[in-house]
Amino acid sequence: MSLSEFSLSGKKALVIGARRNMGKGFALGLAEAGADVAVTDINIESGQLQAVSEQIEAMGRKSIFLKTDISSQKDVKKMVDKVMLEFGGID
């Protein structure tokens, strides 16, 4: 099956560690397949995570970016709450 036959249209995804490397690739691949994608990373100061979010939006998908330390239960709850509010769910 080629990516053109694989559709995630209408789905909502969350990718942790999406600033670079594999996480970035996963986020962009999900968006290319039609999903709206929330991207998170512990480091957002470099602007790389925002750039990933902007690439997703350039594909016509909805995207938000969030600073999240997944070792912090408080941060994880805040992340999930924000994604649920903005996207209405996570598939």
PLM feature spans:
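Canonical Rossmann dinucleotide-binding motif of NAD(H)/NADP(H)-dependent dehydrogenases/reductases
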Residues: 5-38
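The beta1-alpha1 cofactor-binding region of Rossmann-like NAD(H)/NADP(H)-dependent oxidoreductases
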Residues: 46, 66-81
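Rossmann-fold scaffold of SDR-type NAD(P)-dependent oxidoreductases
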Residues: 16, 67-68, 90-91
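A short helix-to-beta-strand connector/capping loop
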Residues: 56-64, 74
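Conserved glycine-rich Rossmann-like NAD(P)H-binding loop of the short-chain dehydrogenase/reductase
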Residues: 35-51
